[in-house]
Amino acid sequence: MIKKRVIPCLDVKDGRVVKGIQFQSLRDIGNPVDLALYYNEAGADELVFLDISKTEAGHDLMIEVIEATAKQLFIPLTVGGGIQNLDDITQLLNHGADKISLNSSALKHPELIRQASEKFGRQCICIAIDSFYDKDRKDYFCTTHGGKKLTDVRVYDWVQEVELLGAGELLITSMHHDGMKQGFDIEHLAKIKQLVNIPIIASGGGGNAQHFVELFQQTDVSAGLAASILHDQETTVAEIKDKMREGGILVR
């Protein structure tokens, strides 16, 4: 049986880690390099950096952050946000990222997934999906631009398409659960896992260690993402893993 992963997520804006609720009301959390090294020592299995900077200067700062972090990090680092083309991917990998995460650019140019997978290997390519439940249409749809723009692309269709195009992993954020700390969107995640064979990282809703136990007991996703509950020290990676062990879940 594959051991499950616990992955802290750091949203980085203009060189600082920030966190909000449902992608809004951002507050400053701290220095990304310091936090990354803290989680490295705390037992995190991987790290995710999402660059949400609005300016070119902010994106340039992100390169410096990645380089400084990668020199001292001993766990895999996934980087996403603002990636538009193969040159951007090359730059990130050359500066220390182990994997890259594509979101809006993949929806706009699906062929980028195939090109990146063929050039760098599918193990490097994670497709991030900000999933929004449309009550009127009673279905989940992909959003872009940090969850601000709703598309007509069904999540259940898109996950299958990106796997065929060469994605090696999915990062699914349930927007209506994000930052709410009420638990993961179990039913949605379980359905996605039935449609694909690649690993899934679940994001959005993890409010305590028990939520991670429920996630792994009720779905076959590979990893759970956590942000504010770790940044605010409401729990720790070690506490989450201890609770998972108590629940009979294999951890690293």
From Swiss-Prot:
- Tell me what reaction this enzyme catalyses: 5-[(5-phospho-1-deoxy-D-ribulos-1-ylimino)methylamino]-1-(5-phospho-beta-D-ribosyl)imidazole-4-carboxamide + L-glutamine = D-erythro-1-(imidazol-4-yl)glycerol 3-phosphate + 5-amino-1-(5-phospho-beta-D-ribosyl)imidazole-4-carboxamide + L-glutamate + H(+)
Tell me, how does this one assemble?
Heterodimer of HisH and HisF.
Entry's Gene Ontology cellular component terms = cytoplasm
- What is the source species? Staphylococcus epidermidis (strain ATCC 12228 / FDA PCI 1200)
Annotated coiled-coil positions are none
Recorded hits in InterPro entries, A to Z, give: Aldolase_TIM, His_biosynth, HisF, IGPS_HisA/HisF, RibuloseP-bd_barrel
Q: Which domain of life is it from?
A: Bacteria
EC no.?
4.3.2.10
Q: Where in the cell is it found?
A: Cytoplasm
Lineage, broadest ranks: Bacteria, Bacillati, Bacillota, Bacilli, Bacillales
The catalytic residues are 11, 130
Q: Which PANTHER family match?
A: IMIDAZOLE GLYCEROL PHOSPHATE SYNTHASE HISHF, IMIDAZOLE GLYCEROL PHOSPHATE SYNTHASE SUBUNIT HISF/H IGP SYNTHASE SUBUNIT HISF/H
For this UniProt entry, which segments traverse the membrane?
A: none
The pathway entry for this protein reads as: Amino-acid biosynthesis; L-histidine biosynthesis; L-histidine from 5-phospho-alpha-D-ribose 1-diphosphate: step 5/9
Record GO terms (molecular function): imidazoleglycerol-phosphate synthase activity; lyase activity
Protein name in the entry: Imidazole glycerol phosphate synthase subunit HisF
The family note in this entry says: Belongs to the HisA/HisF family.
- GO biological process: any one? L-histidine biosynthetic process
Question: What Pfam families would the database entry show?
Answer: His_biosynth
* Protein function: IGPS catalyzes the conversion of PRFAR and glutamine to IGP, AICAR and glutamate. The HisF subunit catalyzes the cyclization activity that produces IGP and AICAR from PRFAR using the ammonia provided by the HisH subunit.
Keywords of this entry: Amino-acid biosynthesis, Cytoplasm, Histidine biosynthesis, Lyase
